[in-house]
C-alpha cells in the first residue's frame, strides 16, 4: 500500500467546546422516511419492476412508515408510472406522505409536479451538490453559483405548489453535506429557508446527508449539532439525516446525530443502497427497542420483512446481519450456550417482564423468531447447549452429570464429522445411546414384586429380561422395585452395581403421558448413566437401570 499520509488527508474536526450530544440519549423515535424505492432501487443490479416495487411499497405501509420516497419520476417513465400508481391505486393512508426526488432543474421540476397530481401532502425533495470537491471538479462553480441553483429551484417549487392549490411539503438536501464546509452549507440552507418560509403547520425538511461517509461518527454528530444551533427559523425546520455506510459506521453516526438534535432519518430496510449502502432503519429501530424506546415501526415479523426485501431487491441478507441474519440468535460456543441455557431458566423462574438473558440483547420472539435455533451444536459446543436443545425441543431435562457425559459423546461425533449437528440428530443419538440401545445385551421385559416372607419392608422383585435375545428370569431383594432389581441384576451379571443418582420427570401431560427416568450407576470402574422411557414410571426406572448396566458391560468389555 502507498503511504497513507501522502495520499489521504484526515477529516477536520469541528470546534464545539460546549457540545451537548455526548451527554444525551435517544428517548423517542425520529420521523422515519424509507428511501428503499429510490436510493435503494437505484443501487440494484436489476432495478425493481412494478410488481417488486408494489410489494415493497405495501410492506413499508404495513410497517408504519409515514413518509416514503417512491422514486425519481422525472428521471424515467418507470418511476413516473409508479408514482402515478401510488397516487391512484396505492391505497395510501391519509397520514402518509409520498416523497419524490428531483434535481434543481426547471424541466424536471415540472415533470415531478405532474407525477404527484392528486397526491395527499406529498413531499417535493429537491437537491443539488454543494461539496467543495464537486463545486471545483464537477460543476466549476463558486459558492454563490451553487447557492443560486438551490434558491432558484426553491422559488420555482414553492410557486408551482401555490398555483396547484397548496398542500405540498418541501425538503431540501445540500447533497454531499459532509464534504461541504459548514459555513457554506449553512449559507445555502438559510437561503432556501428564506425562500420557502416554513411555518409551524408546514415545516421545511432540511436533509443533511452523509452522502459519502468520510469521518468518524462523532464528527457527523458535531456537524448536526452545529447546524441545529445556527440554522435560521429552527423551530419550523425538521433536521433530517441521510447517512451512508462507507466506513461501516452508518448506524453509530445516525444514533449520535439523533442525540445531537436531528428529528428525522432517511434510510432503507437492512441498509441496501449505493456502494456500502444507506443506513439500516430496521437495525436502528430495534436498537431503540432494546433500550426501552418504542421505535414506531412494526418489526414483529422480521422474517416476512426479510422475504419481501429479498424478493424486491433480488439480494440476500448475510447470516450475521443484526437482528435478522440466520445465525444472530445462535450460539455455538459452549460457554455461551451454557449461559443462555441458565438465563432462559432464570427468566422463567423470575417471571418478571424485563428481558435478561446472556448473549441475547433482544427476545427473538419480539421479532417473530423462535428459540429453536438459539443454540446449535458443533465441535465448539458445550453441555449447556446440548441440554438446552433437548429440553426446549423434546422436553428432556438432563441431570447435570449426564449433560457432561453426553456432551463427550456429541463432541466425538462433531470432531469426526466436522459439521454442525441438528437438534433431531442430537435427540436421535440420545435415544439410541441411552434408551433403545439396539445392540445392547440386556433388555427389560417385565417385573412384579411380592413380600419377602418374614422380612418387614423387604420385597422380592421377580423380573423378566432377555440376554442376547434369550429370555431369563431373575430375582432380587430390596426395599422397593429399584433396589430389588439392582440386586437381581448385580447377582445375574456378577458385577457390583449401585445407584448413585436417580431422577425422573414426565415428557407430556395427561393420563397417558410418558415419563423418563435417569439412573447414574456406580460400578467398580466408575459411574455411567442410563435412561428409560415408559408410560409406567416404575418400568421407566427399571429400563434406565438396564440401560446403565448395558453401558457398564460395554465399558468392561473394552
UniProtKB/Swiss-Prot annotation:
GO terms for cellular component: cytoplasm. Mg(2+) binds at residues 39, 242, 244, 278. The keyword Signal does not apply. Its EC number is 2.3.3.13. One of its GO terms (molecular function) is acetyl-CoA C-acetyltransferase activity. Residues 437-558 are annotated as: Regulatory domain. It comes from the Bacteria. It is found in: Cytoplasm. Its main location: cytoplasm. InterPro entries: 2-isopropylmalate_synth_dimer, AIPM/Hcit_synth_CS, Aldolase_TIM, IPM_Synthase, LeuA-like_post-cat, LeuA_allosteric_dom_sf, LeuA_N_DRE-TIM, PYR_CT. Pathway: Amino-acid biosynthesis; L-leucine biosynthesis; L-leucine from 3-methyl-2-oxobutanoate: step 1/4. Its cofactor is Mg(2+). It holds the Pfam family HMGL-like. CDD domains: DRE_TIM_LeuA. Gene3D superfamilies: 3.30.160.270, Aldolase class I. GO terms for biological process: L-leucine biosynthetic process. Residues 30-303 form the Pyruvate carboxyltransferase domain. It catalyses: 3-methyl-2-oxobutanoate + acetyl-CoA + H2O = (2S)-2-isopropylmalate + CoA + H(+). Keywords: Amino-acid biosynthesis, Branched-chain amino acid biosynthesis, Cytoplasm, Leucine biosynthesis, Magnesium, Metal-binding, Transferase. NCBIfam families: leuA_yeast, PRK03739.1. Catalyzes the condensation of the acetyl group of acetyl-CoA with 3-methyl-2-oxobutanoate (2-ketoisovalerate) to form 3-carboxy-3-hydroxy-4-methylpentanoate (2-isopropylmalate). Homodimer. Belongs to the alpha-IPM synthase/homocitrate synthase family. LeuA type 2 subfamily. This is 2-isopropylmalate synthase. The gene is leuA.
Amino acid at each position: 500500500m502507498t503511504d497513507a499520509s501522502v495520499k489521504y488527508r484526515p477529516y477536520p474536526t469541528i470546534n464545539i467546546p460546549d457540545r451537548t450530544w455526548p451527554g444525551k440519549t435517544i428517548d423517542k423515535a425520529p420521523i422515519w422516511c424509507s428511501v428503499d424505492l429510490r436510493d435503494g432501487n437505484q443501487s440494484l443490479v436489476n432495478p425493481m419492476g412494478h410488481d417488486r416495487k408494489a410489494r415493497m411499497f405495501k410492506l413499508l405501509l404495513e410497517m408504519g412508515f409515514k413518509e416514503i420516497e417512491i422514486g425519481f419520476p422525472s428521471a424515467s417513465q418507470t418511476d413516473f408510472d409508479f408514482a402515478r400508481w401510488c397516487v391512484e391505486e396505492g391505497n395510501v393512508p391519509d397520514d402518509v406522505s409520498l416523497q419524490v426526488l428531483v434535481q434543481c432543474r426547471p424541466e424536471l421540476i415540472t415533470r415531478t409536479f405532474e407525477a404527484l397530481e392528486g397526491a395527499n401532502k406529498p413531499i417535493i425533495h429537491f437537491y443539488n451538490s454543494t461539496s467543495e470537491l464537486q463545486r471545483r471538479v464537477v460543476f466549476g462553480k463558486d459558492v454563490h453559483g451553487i447557492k443560486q441553483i438551490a434558491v432558484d429551484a426553491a422559488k420555482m417549487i414553492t410557486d408551482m405548489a401555490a398555483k396547484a392549490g397548496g398542500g405540498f411539503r418541501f425538503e431540501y438536501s445540500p447533497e454531499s453535506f459532509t464534504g461541504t464546509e459548514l459555513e457554506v452549507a449553512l449559507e445555502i440552507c438559510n437561503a432556501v429557508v428564506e425562500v420557502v418560509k416554513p411555518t409551524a403547520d408546514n415545516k421545511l425538511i432540511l436533509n443533511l446527508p452523509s452522502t459519502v461517509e468520510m469521518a468518524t461518527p462523532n464528527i457527523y454528530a458535531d456537524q448536526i449539532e452545529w447546524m441545529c444551533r445556527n440554522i435560521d427559523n429552527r423551530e419550523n425546520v425538521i433536521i433530517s439525516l441521510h447517512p451512508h455506510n462507507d466506513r461501516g459506521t452508518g448506524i453509530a453516526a445516525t444514533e449520535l446525530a439523533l442525540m445531537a438534535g436531528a428529528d428525522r432519518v432517511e434510510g432503507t430496510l437492512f441498509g441496501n443502497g449505493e456502494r456500502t449502502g444507506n443506513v439500516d432503519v430496521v437495525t436502528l429501530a430495534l436498537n431503540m427497542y432494546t433500550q426501552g424506546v418504542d421505535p414506531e415501526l412494526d418489526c414483529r415479523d422480521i422474517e416476512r420483512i426479510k422475504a419481501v426485501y429479498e424478493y424486491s431487491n433480488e439480494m440476500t441478507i448475510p447470516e450475521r446481519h443484526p437482528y435478522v441474519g440466520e445465525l444472530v440468535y445462535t450460539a455455538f460456543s459452549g460457554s455461551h450456550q451454557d449461559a443462555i441455557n441458565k438465563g432462559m431458566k432464570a427468566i422463567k423462574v423470575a417471571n418478571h417482564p424485563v428481558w435478561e438473558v446472556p448473549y441475547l440483547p433482544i427476545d427473538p420472539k419480539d421479532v417473530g423468531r423462535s428459540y429453536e435455533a438459539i443454540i446449535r451444536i458443533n465441535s465448539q459446543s458445550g453441555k449447556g447447549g446440548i441440554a438446552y436443545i433437548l429440553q426446549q425441543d423434546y422436553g428432556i431435562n438432563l441431570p447435570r452429570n449426564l449433560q457432561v457425559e453426553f456432551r463427550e459423546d456429541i463432541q466425538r461425533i462433531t470432531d469426526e464429522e466436522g459439521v454442525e449437528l441438528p437438534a433431531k440428530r442430537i435427540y436421535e443419538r440420545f435415544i439410541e445411546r441411552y434408551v433403545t440401545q439396539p445392540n445392547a445385551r440386556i433388555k427389560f421385559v417385565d417385573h412384579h414384586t411380592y413380600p419377602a416372607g418374614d422380612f418387614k419392608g423387604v420385597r422380592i422383585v421377580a423380573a423378566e429380561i432377555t440376554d442376547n435375545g434369550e429370555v431369563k428370569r431373575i430375582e432380587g431383594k430390596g426395599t422397593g422395585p429399584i433396589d430389588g432389581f439392582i440386586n437381581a441384576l448385580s447377582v445375574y451379571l456378577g458385577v457390583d452395581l449401585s445407584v448413585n443418582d436417580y431422577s425422573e420427570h414426565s415428557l407430556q401431560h395427561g393420563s397417558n403421558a410418558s415419563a423418563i427416568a435417569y439412573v447414574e450407576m456406580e460400578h467398580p470402574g466408575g459411574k455411567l448413566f442410563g435412561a428409560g422411557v415408559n408410560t409406567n414410571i416404575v418400568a421407566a426406572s427399571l429400563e434406565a437401570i438396564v440401560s446403565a448396566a448395558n453401558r457398564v458391560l460395554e465399558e468392561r468389555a473394552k
